[in-house]
C-alpha cells in the first residue's frame, strides 16, 4: 500500500476530472444499456423542447430516493474524512474505508448532476464549504504517524456492492418507466401530426394561397425554427464532447466496451496515488498519477484518491472541473447518435450567455429551416440515392458488355496471330523458292556466258528463232489442249457408259435377289402344305379306325338284339304258361333295357354319319390342296428357269462391261501420261520465274501490311488494356465510395426524418390559429397574397436574368463527369461540407414557410428542325401556385448529390460552387480522348462568359468531349464503324459525350430538353414519371404533334398518350405501358432507357 507514496517530481500533472472519471466509469458502464434504450425513443421528442424543458424532464425521470441518499451520505462522510488525514500516511486502509461513503455520495451526486443544473450547483457549493473544514486538520497533521489498524471486514465491500446494485436497479426501473411513457407520447404525437397535415392541407386549399405567405401568425413557427436550430447545434456540440471524452478515456487505457462481471471487478483499474509531500510543496493543488504496471489497486486507494482530488479542487475553488467531471460521468451513458437526450454540462457551465450566443448565431439561418425544406431535402436525397444506384447498375451493365467485347477482341487477336504465323511460314517458303530460282538463273546465266551465247532479252525478242520457238510452242499448246479436250470427252463418255453398266448390273442383282426371295417363299409354302397334307392323312386314318370300331360295335349290338328277341319269345312262352305278375315285371324290365339299347344305337348311328361326312370333307380338301400344290410347283419351276436364264445373260453382259472398263482405264492412264508430258513441256522456266517474282512482290507487300497492322493492333491492345485496368480500379473505388455515401445518406435521412417529426409537432398550435385567421382575415389575406405575388414576380424577373447567365456559364464550362471526377468529388465532399453550408445561403430573404427560390428557365431551345420555322423563343407564363409545385434549388442539396447531377439546367442563383477537383480538370475520362480534346477540356475556365438571355435560342458552343470507344478504334474503316453504330446506336453518343452510354444518353436528353419548363432530367426513372420529359423530347422533332404549352404535370395520362402517339406516328413502337407509367412514381429505368434509345436511334442515326 506504500507504493503510491513515490516521489512525483517528474510525474505529469493530471486533471482531477480524469480520476473522477476512472472511479465512476464502472457505474456508467453498468447503466449504459438502460440509458441508450431511453435515449433513442426520447431523442425525437427532446429536440422540440427548449433547454429548460429538457433539464426539467431529465430531472423528473430520476427517483427521489437517490437525492435523499446523497444528502445523507454527504453529511456523514465529513468526520470520517477529517479523521482520514490525521495520520502520517494518507492512503492507509482506515482512511480509505472512511472515505468510501464519500465516494458513493460523490458518484450518486455526479449521476444526478447530469439531469439538473441548479441542483448540481447547490450540491457543489455544499461540498466545497464543508469538506475544507474536515480537511484542515488532515493537512496540518500529515507528518503525524497513523495509529489506526488496517483491518477492514468484507461486510463493507458486500454492503457497498449491494447498495450500488440497488441504485442501478432503481435507476433502471425508473428509466424503463420513462421509456414507456415517451413511447406512448411519441405514438400520440404521430397521430396528431397526421391530423395536423390533413388540416393544413385543407386550410391551404380553402385559403387558395401558397405556403410562402408571411403573416404575424408565423411567429410561433419562427420561434420553433430557432429552437430547432439551437437543438441541432447542441447536438453537434454534444457529439464533439462525447468524441473528445472517448479519446481521453482511450488515452488513459480505459474502454467503453468493458462490462465487469462482479462488483469486485468494478475497481480493477490501474492504481492512482497521491504523494503527501506534494500538498505541502504545492499548497495541496498538485495531483499525481503513479501507474505501476498493470497491478490493480484496492478499492480504498481509489476512493481515497478521489477524496484527495475533490479536496484539492475545492481548495482551488474551480467549478469548471466539477462540471467537466459531471459531464464525463454522464456522457458515457449516451451514444454519439443519441447525445441529444443528455444535457451538456460544458454548455451548462457557460449558462445563459452561451445559449444567447448560439441563438444569435443561428438567427441568420432560421429562415432556411422549415418543414417544407426538410421534406424537399429528404426527397432530393432519395432522388440522389436512386440516381446513384441507377448509374451504378448501368455502369455494371456496360462493364459486362465491355468484358464481352474484350473477350471477342482477344479471340480476334489470337486468330490474327495464327494467320500471321501462317503468312510468315508461307513467306519463308516463298523466300526459299525465290533464292533457289535466283541461284538457278545465275547458273543458267553462267552457262550462257561460258558458251558465249547471247541472252539479251531484246535480241531474243527480235530474233526469228525466238518467234519460231514461240510459234511452235503455241501450236503444241493448242494441239495439246485439243487432244486433252478430246480425251476428256472420251473419258466422260466412258465414265457415263460405266455408270450405266453398273446401274444395269445393280438392277439385275436386285431382280435376282427378289426372285431368290420369292423362290424361298414358295418353298416354305410347299413345305407348309406338305405338313398339312400329312396331318390330314393321319386324321383320315384315325377316322377309318374309328369307323371300323363303330362297325364292329354295330355287329355286336345286332347280336345282342337277336339274343334279346329270343329271350322275349321265351318270356312270352313263360307268360302264357306261368304267373302273369312275374312275367309282367320281366317284360317291363326288358322293355326298359330295349329302350336304352335303341337310344344308344341311334346315338351311335348319328356319330357314324358325322364321321363319314367329316372324312368326305377332308378327302375333298386334300384333293384340292394337292391340285394347288401341283400347279404352284410347276409355276415356280418355270419362273426359276426363266430367272436362271436372265441371270446368265446379265453375268455375260457384266463380264463384257468389265473388260471394256479395264480397257478404258488403260486408255485413260495412257492419256493422262500424255497430258502430263504436255504440261511438263508447257511449263517453261521464264514463266515460272516471272510468276514467282510477282508472287514474291505480293507477299512482301502483304508482309509489310501485316507487320504494320500487327504493330497498330499491339499498340491499341496495350492502350485498351491499360485503360481497362484503370477503369476497373476507378469503378471499384466508385462503388465503394457510393456505398459509403449511401449509408451516410440513409443515416442523415433518418436524422432528418426525426427532425421533421419533431418540427411537425409544433404545427398543432398553428392549426387553430390558421382556422381563426381564415374566418377573420380572408379578404385581408387575399390582398396580401396579391401584393406578395407582384413582389415575387418582380423577384423572379430579377432572378430570371442572373440565373440564366449562371446557367449558361455552368453549362458551357462544366466538363462531363467521369469516374475519377466522381471519386474526387466524393473525397472532397466531407472536407468542404462546412464551407459549402456557409456559402449556400440564398440572397433573397424569405419566410420560413416560403418555397426555396426556383430557377426561371430561359426560352425553350429550338432544335435544328425548327430553326427555319420558329423565329422566337418559347415564352412561359409562371404563376405563384406553379412555383410551389417546382422542386427546390440546390441550396439544400448536399455536395455529393450536386456532383452526381449530370445536368446543370436546374441550378439556381444560390447553387453550390463547383468542387475544385472538376475545375482543375485533372481527371481523365474512362473512354479514350484525343490530345486536342483533352487540351480543350483543360483550357475551359470555370468563370467563362456565357451568352445573354436574348440569344438563348441559338445553339451555344458546348465543350467537345467526343472520343472513340475501344470497340470503334479497333475497326479499320469508316464503313465498319457505321455498321457498329447501327448495331449499337449509343456507341457514337458515348464517344461524343464521354463516359458511359447511360450518362451520354442522359446528357443528350438534357441537351435536347434544355429550356423547356418543368423539365429536370437527372435519371431514367422519376424524372420521366409525369410524361413532360417525353413530350419535350419529341416536341423538338415533332412540334406539330405535341402542344407543349398546353401540357401540365398533373395530367400524366394525357402527356404519355400524346408522346406515345407522336412516336408511333413516325414508326417508333411503344414498349411502355401507359397505365403502369401513370400508376408508378419510379418506373423501371431499363425499360425507359430502351424506349429513349429507340427515339434517339430513329431521329439521330
UniProtKB/Swiss-Prot annotation:
Residues 29-48, 64-86 have a biased composition (Polar residues). Residues 114-125, 151-165, 929-939 have a biased composition (Basic and acidic residues). PROSITE patterns: CH. Involved in cytokinesis and spindle organization. May play a role in actin cytoskeleton organization and microtubule stabilization and hence required for proper cell adhesion and migration. GO terms for biological process: cell division. It comes from the Eukaryota. It comes from Xenopus tropicalis. Residues 162-254, 373-427, 492-785 form a coiled coil. Residues 1-170, 280-366, 923-978 are annotated as: Disordered. This is Cytospin-A. Belongs to the cytospin-A family.
Amino acid at each position: 500500500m506504500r507504493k503510491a507514496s513515490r516521489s512525483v517530481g517528474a510525474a505529469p500533472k493530471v486533471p482531477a476530472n480524469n480520476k473522477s472519471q476512472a472511479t465512476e466509469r464502472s457505474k456508467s458502464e453498468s447503466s449504459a444499456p438502460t440509458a441508450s434504450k431511453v435515449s433513442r425513443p426520447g431523442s425525437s421528442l427532446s429536440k422540440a423542447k427548449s433547454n429548460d424543458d429538457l433539464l426539467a424532464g431529465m430531472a423528473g425521470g430520476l427517483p427521489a430516493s437517490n437525492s435523499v441518499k446523497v444528502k445523507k451520505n454527504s453529511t456523514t462522510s465529513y468526520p470520517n474524512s477529517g479523521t482520514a488525514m490525521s495520520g502520517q500516511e494518507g492512503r492507509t486502509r482506515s482512511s480509505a474505508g472512511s472515505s468510501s461513503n464519500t465516494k458513493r455520495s460523490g458518484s450518486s451526486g455526479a449521476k444526478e448532476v447530469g439531469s439538473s443544473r441548479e441542483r448540481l450547483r447547490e450540491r457543489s457549493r455544499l461540498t466545497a464549504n464543508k469538506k475544507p473544514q474536515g480537511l484542515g486538520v488532515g493537512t496540518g497533521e500529515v507528518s503525524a504517524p497513523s495509529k489506526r489498524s488496517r483491518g477492514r471486514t468484507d461486510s463493507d465491500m458486500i454492503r457497498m456492492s449491494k447498495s450500488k446494485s440497488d441504485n442501478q436497479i432503481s435507476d433502471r426501473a425508473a428509466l424503463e418507466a420513462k421509456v414507456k411513457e415517451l413511447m406512448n407520447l411519441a405514438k400520440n404525437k404521430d397521430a396528431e401530426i397526421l391530423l395536423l397535415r390533413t388540416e393544413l392541407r385543407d386550410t391551404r386549399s380553402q385559403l387558395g394561397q401558397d405556403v410562402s405567405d408571411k403573416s404575424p401568425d408565423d411567429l410561433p413557427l419562427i420561434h420553433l425554427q430557432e429552437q430547432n436550430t439551437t437543438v441541432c447545434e447542441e447536438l453537434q456540440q454534444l457529439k464533439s464532447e462525447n468524441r473528445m471524452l472517448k479519446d481521453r478515456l482511450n488515452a488513459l487505457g480505459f474502454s467503453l466496451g468493458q462490462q465487469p462481471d462482479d462488483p469486485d471487478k468494478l475497481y480493477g483499474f490501474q492504481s492512482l496515488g497521491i504523494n503527501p509531500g506534494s500538498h505541502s510543496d504545492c499548497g495541496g493543488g498538485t495531483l499525481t498519477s503513479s501507474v505501476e504496471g498493470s497491478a490493480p489497486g484496492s478499492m480504498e486507494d481509489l476512493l481515497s484518491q478521489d477524496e484527495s482530488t475533490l479536496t484539492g479542487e475545492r481548495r482551488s475553488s474551480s467549478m469548471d472541473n466539477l462540471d467537466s467531471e459531471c459531464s464525463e460521468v454522464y456522457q458515457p451513458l449516451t451514444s454519439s447518435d443519441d447525445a441529444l437526450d443528455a444535457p451538456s454540462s460544458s454548455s451548462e457551465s457557460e449558462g445563459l450567455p452561451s445559449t444567447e450566443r448560439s441563438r444569435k448565431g443561428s438567427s441568420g439561418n432560421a429562415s432556411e429551416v422549415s418543414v417544407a425544406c426538410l421534406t424537399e431535402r429528404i426527397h432530393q436525397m432519395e432522388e440522389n440515392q436512386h440516381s446513384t444506384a441507377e448509374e451504378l447498375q448501368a455502369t455494371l451493365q456496360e462493364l459486362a458488355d465491355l468484358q464481352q467485347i474484350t473477350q471477342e477482341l482477344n479471340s480476334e487477336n489470337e486468330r490474327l496471330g495464327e494467320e500471321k504465323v501462317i503468312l510468315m511460314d508461307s513467306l519463308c517458303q516463298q523466300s526459299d523458292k525465290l533464292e533457289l530460282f535466283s541461284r538457278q538463273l545465275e547458273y543458267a546465266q553462267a552457262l550462257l556466258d561460258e558458251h558465249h551465247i547471247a541472252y539479251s532479252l531484246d535480241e531474243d525478242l527480235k530474233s526469228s528463232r525466238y518467234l519460231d520457238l514461240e510459234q511452235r510452242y503455241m501450236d503444241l499448246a493448242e494441239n495439246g489442249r485439243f487432244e486433252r479436250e478430246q480425251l476428256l470427252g472420251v473419258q466422260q463418255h466412258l465414265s457415263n457408259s460405266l455408270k450405266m453398266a453398273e446401274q444395269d448390273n445393280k438392277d439385275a442383282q436386285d431382280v435376282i435377289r427378289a426372285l431368290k426371295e420369292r423362290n424361298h417363299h414358295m418353298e416354305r409354302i410347299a413345305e407348309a402344305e406338305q405338313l398339312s397334307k400329312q396331318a390330314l392323312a393321319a386324321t383320315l386314318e384315325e377316322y377309318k379306325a374309328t369307323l371300323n370300331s363303330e362297325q364292329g360295335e354295330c355287329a355286336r349290338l345286332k347280336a345282342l338284339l337277336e339274343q334279346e328277341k329270343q329271350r322275349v319269345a321265351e318270356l312270352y312262352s313263360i307268360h302264357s304258361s306261368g304267373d302273369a305278375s312275374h312275367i309282367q315285371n320281366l317284360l317291363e324290365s326288358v322293355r326298359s333295357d330295349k329302350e336304352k339299347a335303341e337310344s344308344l344305337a341311334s346315338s351311335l348311328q348319328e356319330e357314324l354319319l358325322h364321321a363319314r361326312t367329316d372324312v368326305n370333307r377332308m378327302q375333298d380338301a386334300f384333293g384340292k390342296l394337292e391340285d394347288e400344290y401341283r400347279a404352284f410347283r410347276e409355276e415356280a419351276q418355270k419362273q426359276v428357269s426363266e430367272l436362271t436364264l436372265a441371270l446368265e445373260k446379265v453375268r455375260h453382259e457384266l463380264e463384257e462391261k468389265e473388260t471394256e472398263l479395264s480397257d478404258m482405264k488403260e486408255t485413260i492412264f495412257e492419256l493422262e501420261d500424255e497430258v502430263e508430258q504436255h504440261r511438263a513441256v508447257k511449263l517453261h522456266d521464264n514463266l515460272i520465274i516471272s510468276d514467282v517474282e510477282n508472287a514474291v512482290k505480293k507477299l512482301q507487300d502483304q508482309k509489310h501490311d501485316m507487320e504494320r497492322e500487327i504493330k497498330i493492333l499491339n499498340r491499341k491492345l496495350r492502350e485498351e488494356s491499360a485503360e481497362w485496368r484503370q477503369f476497373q480500379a476507378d469503378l471499384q473505388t466508385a462503388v465503394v465510395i457510393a456505398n459509403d455515401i449511401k449509408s451516410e445518406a440513409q443515416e442523415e435521412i433518418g436524422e432528418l426524418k426525426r427532425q421533421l417529426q419533431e418540427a411537425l409537432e409544433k404545427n398543432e398550435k398553428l392549426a387553430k390559429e390558421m382556422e381563426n385567421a381564415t374566418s377573420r382575415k380572408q379578404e385581408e389575406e387575399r390582398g396580401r397574397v396579391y401584393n406578395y405575388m407582384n413582389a415575387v414576380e418582380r423577384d423572379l424577373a430579377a432572378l430570371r436574368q442572373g440565373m440564366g447567365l449562371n446557367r449558361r456559364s455552368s453549362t458551357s464550362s462544366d466538363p462531363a463527369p467521369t469516374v475519377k471526377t466522381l471519386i474526387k468529388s466524393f473525397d472532397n465532399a466531407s472536407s468542404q461540407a462546412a464551407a459549402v453550408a456557409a456559402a449556400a445561403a440564398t440572397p433573397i430573404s424569405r419566410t420560413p414557410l416560403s418555397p426555396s427560390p426556383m430557377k426561371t428557365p430561359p426560352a425553350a431551345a429550338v432544335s435544328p428542325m425548327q430553326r427555319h420555322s420558329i423565329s422566337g423563343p418559347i415564352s412561359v407564363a409562371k404563376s405563384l401556385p406553379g412555383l410551389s409545385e417546382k422542386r427546390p434549388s440546390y441550396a439544400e442539396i448536399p455536395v455529393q448529390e450536386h456532383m452526381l447531377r449530370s445536368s446543370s439546367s436546374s441550378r439556381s442563383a444560390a447553387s453550390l460552387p463547383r468542387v475544385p477537383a472538376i475545375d482543375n480538370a485533372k481527371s481523365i475520362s474512362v473512354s479514350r480522348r484525343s490530345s486536342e480534346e483533352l487540351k480543350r477540356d483543360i483550357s475551359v475556365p470555370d468563370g467563362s462568359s456565357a451568352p445573354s438571355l436574348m440569344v438563348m435560342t441559338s445553339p451555344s458552343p458546348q465543350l467537345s468531349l467526343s472520343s472513340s470507344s475501344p470497340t470503334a478504334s479497333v475497326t479499320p474503316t469508316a464503313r465498319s464503324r457505321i455498321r457498329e453504330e447501327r448495331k449499337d446506336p449509343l456507341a457514337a453518343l458515348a464517344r461524343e459525350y464521354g463516359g458511359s452510354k447511360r450518362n451520354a444518353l442522359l446528357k443528350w436528353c438534357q441537351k435536347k430538353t434544355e429550356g423547356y419548363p418543368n423539365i429536370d432530367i437527372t435519371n431514367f426513372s422519376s424524372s420521366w414519371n409525369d410524361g413532360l420529359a417525353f413530350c419535350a423530347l419529341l416536341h423538338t422533332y415533332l412540334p406539330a404533334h405535341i402542344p407543349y404549352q398546353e401540357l401540365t404535370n398533373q395530367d400524366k395520362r394525357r402527356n404519355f398518350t400524346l408522346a406515345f402517339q407522336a412516336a408511333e406516328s413516325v414508326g417508333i413502337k411503344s414498349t411502355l405501358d401507359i397505365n403502369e407509367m401513370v400508376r408508378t412514381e419510379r418506373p423501371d429505368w431499363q425499360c425507359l432507357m430502351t424506349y429513349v434509345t429507340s427515339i434517339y436511334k430513329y431521329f439521330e442515326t
